[in-house]
From Swiss-Prot:
Protein name: Short neurotoxin 1
Species of origin: Dendroaspis jamesoni kaimosae
Compartments in which it is found: Secreted
GO function terms (MF aspect): acetylcholine receptor inhibitor activity; ion channel regulator activity; toxin activity
Family annotation (Gene3D superfamilies): CD59
Length: 60
């Protein structure tokens, strides 16, 4: 699986992953809205929005 692995507004980068899914986590703090992308489908704490998907580059 090929997943995006960049944060928020940094230039898009991808990674070839062993997992079959990609994720995109979104949350807000004093810096504003933070977006984190990567491989797999992690468990998240309350208040963090998580989107997991199962196709290449699906987590932008």
């Amino acid at each position: 699986r090929i997943c995006y692995n960049h944060q928020s507004t940094t230039p898009a980068t991808t990674k070839s992953c062993g997992e079959n899914s990609c994720y995109k986590k979104t949350w807000s703090d004093h810096r504003g809205t933070i977006i984190e992308r990567g491989c797999g489908c992690p468990k998240v704490k309350q208040g963090i929005h998580l989107h997991c998907c199962q196709s290449d580059k699906c987590n932008n």
